[in-house]
Structure formats: C-alpha cells, structure tokens
C-alpha cells in the first residue's frame, strides 16, 4: 500500500537568517563584493587551435624604427603612448587581453568624437543626394 506521505529525501529549509538565501534573491547591483557578468572577460581562441597555441609577436612590435623618438615626442606633447589593450597573437590569431577594468582602459584614450553632421555635397561623392545625408542625421538623433 502506498503511503500518502512523500518518502523522498528531506530538503533543507531556507530560513530568514540564512545568508545564501539572501544572496540569491538580491540583484547584482546590491552585492558589492561580487563581480557582475559584464565585468568579467573570458578570452577565447578559435577551435582550430590546440590547447597551447604557439606565441607570435608581430615584427613591428619588436623592432620598430624610430620608436624611441616617437615615444619622446608623444611624452613632450602630453599624449598617452602606452597600450590601451595589449593584443596577443597566438598562432597568428589575435585576441584582446583585458588585464584591467574595461572602463579604466577606455578612460586612457581620447573620447570618441561624435560626427554631428555630414556634408550635403562632396565633389568626390558618387551619390550627391540629400537623402543620404538626411538619413545619416536621423540616425544620430
């Protein structure tokens, strides 16, 4: 005869004092110590590469003519000359390695300039229609 009680394993009850229950119910913004999913960058290689791909450094990074002169001129002008994001090449395939927080990396460079207007006429343009420029302006609004 089947009993009316459930004979399955007893599950632990979640109390109000249980910290794990509180953490699972809170959104990510209210959890100060934990990382959110958009703060983490997991690099991926392509499937055609092996487990440990061969390291490749571009030749112009190793031996660039007048590199020291260019760095001195950039320092004199106050231009940041360091890498924003160092790109690694493994087996001739590029990937970006985020060693720093994404927001901190973007603050190093110049801000993006938003083009507010496109000229209505260009002597080099094949299509000299105002429809193209009006469509471009509509996207910026």
Curated annotation (Swiss-Prot):
GO biological process, one term: flagellated sperm motility
InterPro entries: SPMIP10 (IPR027965)
Positions in coiled-coil regions: none
Phenotype upon gene inactivation: No defects seen in the sperm morphology and the percentage of motile spermatozoa is comparable. Howevwer, velocity parameters such as average path velocity, straight-line velocity, and curvilinear velocity are slightly decreased in the spermatozoa.
Pfam family, one: SPMIP10-like
Protein localization: Cytoplasm, Cytoskeleton, Flagellum axoneme
PANTHER family membership: TESTIS-EXPRESSED PROTEIN 43
Protein's UniProt name: Sperm-associated microtubule inner protein 10
UniProt organism field: Mus musculus
Gene it is expressed from: Spmip10
